[in-house]
């Protein structure tokens, strides 16, 4: 049974929440987010809290109960604080620069790698650190993963794009015969 689903989601001041059928609508200023529960859970908004309850007693309803509660919590955190991920570029000649809405990466290929930044995401570059910010946790993580995949870190010298807190396990190189 879900323990996450039991906890109500606290709504901080400045965020409006409405239930419209199966859709939960969050609004803060001009930013709006929607969560479609697809009729898997019951939603109640009262006393500055959003409470979820399962539609049935089957396993699937219980799984959706915790999932939708976590998604709603992520929307609230995204609208209040936002989410961010940091990537680090390691390697001789490897660099990044923002040119308008395009992230331009030099990663040791014979060509530049250009990545168009999607709406709702802000990217800033400071020396060899790329900072990705946004209100949608899934989108921030997806953009970070896409940028990392352009040149994933290799295990011998550690060259490539890695998450700032990621530890790359290094391998020993070839040893000469004696």
Curated annotation (Swiss-Prot):
Molecular function per GO: rRNA binding; structural constituent of ribosome
UniProt keyword Disulfide bond present: no
Gene3D superfamilies per record: Ribosomal protein L6, alpha-beta domain
Keywords on record: Ribonucleoprotein, Ribosomal protein, RNA-binding, rRNA-binding
Organism: Campylobacter hominis (strain ATCC BAA-381 / DSM 21671 / CCUG 45161 / LMG 19568 / NCTC 13146 / CH001A)
Family membership: Belongs to the universal ribosomal protein uL6 family.
Pfam families: Ribosomal_L6 (PF00347)
Protein name per UniProt: Large ribosomal subunit protein uL6
Quaternary structure note: Part of the 50S ribosomal subunit.
